[in-house]
Amino acid sequence: MKAIDSQDLEKHTPMMRQYLTLKAENPDVLLFYRMGDFYELFYDDAKKASELLGISLTARGKSGGDPIPMAGLPYHAVEGYLAKLVQLRVSVAICEQVGDPATSKGPVERKVVRLVTPGTLTDEALLQERQDNLLAAVYHGKKGFGYATLDISSGRFVIAELESCEALEAELQRTSPAELLYSEDFSEMSLISAFEGTRRRPEWEFDFDTSQKLLLDQFGTKDLQGFGLDGARLSLQAAGCLMQYVKDTQRTALPHINSIVRFNQGDSIILDAATRRNLELTMNLQGGHSNTLATVLDNTTTPMGSRMLQRWIHEPLRDRQRIEARQSALEEILENGLYDELHPLLKSLGDVERITARLALRNARPRDFSRLKHALAILPEIQQILARCQSAHLQSLARIISEFPEELALLDSAIVDNPPMLIRDGGVLKPGYNAELDQWRDLSQGATDYLAELEAREKEATGISTLKVGYNRVHGYYIEVSRRESDLVPLSYQRRQTLKNTERYIVAELKEHEEKVLSSQGKALALEKQLWDQLFDLILPQLHELQLFAQGAAELDVLANFAERADTLNYQRPVLTDIPGIQIESGRHPVIEQVSQTPFIANPVTLSPARKMLIVTGPNMGGKSTYMRQVALITLMAHIGCYVPAQSATIGPVDRIFTRIGAADDLASGRSTFMVEMTETANILHNATPKSLVLMDEIGRGTSTYDGLSLAWSAAEYLAQKIEAMTLFATHYFELTQLPELISNVANVHLDAIEHGDTIVFMHAVQDGAASKSYGLQVAALAGVPNPVILAAKHKLHHLESRDNHNTQQTDSSGVQQSMVFPDPIKSPLEEAMESIRPDELSPKQALDILYRLKDLS
């Protein structure tokens, strides 16, 4: 809809002038304009809503001489429609009637009370309960990127200074924001173009001084040094934009956003975007959430615990002391079987974290208060369990998960056991909570009782069996009589409404009591709403303590969950050491062993200063990728404080985990499979260190044999000799199995397979040494390649192998046999026939015969 100037506005009706003015103030969102019991949309908004929501597109007369496209939806069903729009990354402005229709001259006063955007959701119905819902902002400066995230449904505010495009890509993958703000002159659009919820913001919102003032005002401090934000200029600019956006959309105080944390990549094991994707931590390769590490590890009982677990998975710690504190707490819970006691209690807590945020925003509903009351009542039992614990970490959690006796007593006295969904209908506050409220309710109830008496009395006096007293909002109270008995109605009855089968009447006595009922009900509802608002004021002084309690309860849930998982899935406590290397005995892939229909074959791995690289060979489907991934996942699990699927594991310092596993064309960026592969390889070779764990799978397969082998050889050599990273290098280039003869810290391992005639059985067992063959034809047969093709391939394979056996074996300077690295090109039958011709020895007849034969071969 084009902008409307003041002259254009005069052409419209007063109501449409009001709408157009509000729409001009909110041009980039759908405007839900409240009219009675409906939200209406007009013009382009109506057309868009009709298309997205499947609601009818109609017209509302004319205004300014033109028909007005209109679509509407009932106010009581708005949450469902909002949920659908949010999933489509569409933002909505909610415009409510704030004036009194009885006293308004012209259109009732309306204003936009909130903006619903994908990154600023707090309504329970709109949120995924087990996933963080993050609003993010990114700012690009000369020294890198500033990145900030805010979860308005919890108050968690985090910033990060990022030096490179790769680091930003990894953060975007880790945080997966629902909405991403960026500045007008952002120059790296290729990094964020894949996100649906991007919003361009004016440059002034990222101004450093403006941002700093916004944050100081929000936190009520004179400086930001106490938050440890020195040198975080770019990320503070991003954070300032976030705060401005949240203030614009929420239009209320935000007391639960009371601190900000700096995320330092050096505090956790760095995982780039490719690694997070390839290891399928919280999202599988198809974009879903099934069969991921999170689904196996997550048996938490609270939504806030589940969300914390996912954050832990994406932020594996490097600080051994913090990891071992988690391990010790887990061990005590496990050895004493405390998780069986804790699970039902923790489950009763619900989602206190998000309830607390809604309290802070003053949009909590009656059932939020009821759930909070129930959660606070559970705390003494949790405290009794924690009081028996010796772990320092559990004792610290016990101090955070403190009891709230005064708040519990207040809520217990105020909120009924099963409150209605909304305060507007009343009936939320208990009888006895407020004497004046009880008085108005009694008057209302007394008037209601009178109506029952009136109905019985009038039935008896008139002899009308169908007579009954009813009420609706339009006509108020009435006496209803069926059409067939309407002739029995006394003259004192005044007709109020005629329906198809009934007549409705009013009498003076009923009118008088109607006024009493409506007056007492209205005053009771008004007072209850006032007392409801005061309830927020009484609870909010404990907001910070409630937030700490929610965080502590979430962590206790994760630790109890880890104990249950360790017991149920036979996980063992890993040992963290300062000695470089990774030693795993009988390791298992945590996801594959749960979804596999056959018993999982456990395998060992040993990486040390003397054994930095393993060249992994074996058949396709033999388990090379599974083996490598399980090493990475076990390492990651050890660094979040979880027990691991292994008989034992001793793990030294790890700073990064890299994976180069699988690839596909990146059509959006115009990159081929091989380009994607080489880009990821380059990132590893530039950033890996001796403390990095590197998984390299089938490097070089996206190009020609010679180029691919050369690149794979050189990359392996560079990782082993130059970087000395802990590396698992899977390959089908058997030439690479000669590397251990040339480089002392490289060793061969292979995954075994056994042939039975033309079939193959994969043993999935890792053995020392190189594989004897690749079993490619057998795997092709298992995949369903037609038998004639398999037979032809066998014939060609025997031909090539026999030629190799007769070739002179030349060795190049690196020790690789020349015929293996650069085999002779395979000649066609036509080429072979041409080479056999001796022109000087042919007669004209022979030459003509050969010419016909060559024509047949061509």
Curated annotation (Swiss-Prot):
ATP binds at G618, P619, N620, M621, G622, G623, K624, S625. One of its GO terms (biological process) is mismatch repair. CDD domains: ABC_MutS1. Coiled coil: none annotated. InterPro entries: DNA_mismatch_repair_MutS, DNA_mismatch_repair_MutS-lik_N, DNA_mismatch_repair_MutS/MSH, DNA_mismatch_repair_MutS_C, DNA_mismatch_repair_MutS_clamp, DNA_mismatch_repair_MutS_core, DNA_mismatch_repair_MutS_N, DNA_mismatch_repair_MutS_sf. Keywords: ATP-binding, DNA damage, DNA repair, DNA-binding, Nucleotide-binding. Pfam families: MutS_I (PF01624), MutS_II (PF05188), MutS_III (PF05192), MutS_IV (PF05190), MutS_V (PF00488). It comes from the Bacteria. GO terms for cellular component: cytosol. This is DNA mismatch repair protein MutS. The gene is mutS.
